């Protein structure tokens, strides 16, 4: 008769803060996404759990999802004005009261790798952990205990920055300009690699002149973005969060382009 709880990753739950953010920013969204956003708004008035899986009419890859859910990068944690009503926090509180908590591999290792995000650990401490499909563990664990920087991350960062500019800081057009430059520079770097993602030797890629040139441009773009955002710190909590993401991206780029590192694998 023990209590059982199913806990999902944060991207599976409606983010009330991001939903409200997109209330007046229709110019950022295309028609299809706007229709999906209207459906989400209607559903949001009645849902108890905030689990996006309840919306059977919404495809798993619906374009609206990144706009109404959060990630570890853009979540404001305890600084969020909707923290007390957060569906993910409510789900975690329910899990804390359960005798058995069911999660997938990705959430388990993401939780282990969490640092100072404002939420702390999501999964309650357990006496026993049972893995199904344990042969997947090495590949999944390496995703969370390594470091990566992707064009998708920088694109999302630029998108979130554009939203702050359009909704809260309309007097700071340099945010838009610097964000777009960073997004385009990362996209140009991505074009130097195969269309389909593959594993390879990153140290060998770093010997290519065109790759080094584009990495240098990306580094410059991130540095400019860092300085521009710094001028507007404390004006908006979302912008402050983006500043931390830019700082993290700069540091990661420096580490990932240091081919002389010892004791690490680069791919």
Model regions: which residues?
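Generic alpha-helical secondary structure signal
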Residues: 31-38, 50-66, 89, 152, ...
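P-loop NTPase motor domains
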Residues: 48-57, 127, 255-263
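Generic hydrophobic, helix-prone segments enriched in Leu/Val/Ile
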Residues: 39-46, 182, 202, 253-254
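Signature of the SF2 helicase/ATPase Hel1-core->accessory helical subdomain module
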Residues: 72-217
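Helicase motor interdomain insertion/brace
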Residues: 10, 212-267
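A substrate-engagement module of RecA-like helicase motors
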Residues: 1-101, 106-109, 161-162, 194-197, ...
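Short, charged low-complexity intrinsically disordered segments located at boundaries
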Residues: 18-27, 184-193, 213-220, 251-256
């Amino acid at each position: 008769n023990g209590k059982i709880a199913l806990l999902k990753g944060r991207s599976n739950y409606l983010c009330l803060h991001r939903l409200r953010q997109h209330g007046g920013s229709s110019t950022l969204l295309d028609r299809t996404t706007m229709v999906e956003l209207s459906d989400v708004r209607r559903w949001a008035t009645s849902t108890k759990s905030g689990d996006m899986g309840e919306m059977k009419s919404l495809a798993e890859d619906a374009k609206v999802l990144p706009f109404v859910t959060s990630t570890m990068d853009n979540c404001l944690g305890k600084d969020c004005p909707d923290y007390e009503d957060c569906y993910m926090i409510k789900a975690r509180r329910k899990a804390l009261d359960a005798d058995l908590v069911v999660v997938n591999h990705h959430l388990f290792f993401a939780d282990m790798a969490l640092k100072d995000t404002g939420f702390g650990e999501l999964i309650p401490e357990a006496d026993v952990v049972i893995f199904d499909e344990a042969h997947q563990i090495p590949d999944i664990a390496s995703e969370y205990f390594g470091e990566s920087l992707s064009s998708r991350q920088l694109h999302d960062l630029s998108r979130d920055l554009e939203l702050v500019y359009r909704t809260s800081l309309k007097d700071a057009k340099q945010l838009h300009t610097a964000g777009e430059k960073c997004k385009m520079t990362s996209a140009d770097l991505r074009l130097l690699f195969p269309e389909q993602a593959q594993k390879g030797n990153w140290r060998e890629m770093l010997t290519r002149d065109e790759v080094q040139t584009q990495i240098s441009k990306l580094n410059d773009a991130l540095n400019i973005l860092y300085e521009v955002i710094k001028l507007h710190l404390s004006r908006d909590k979302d912008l402050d969060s983006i500043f931390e993401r830019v700082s993290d991206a700069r540091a990661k780029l420096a580490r990932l382009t240091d081919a002389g590192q010892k004791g690490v694998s680069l791919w």
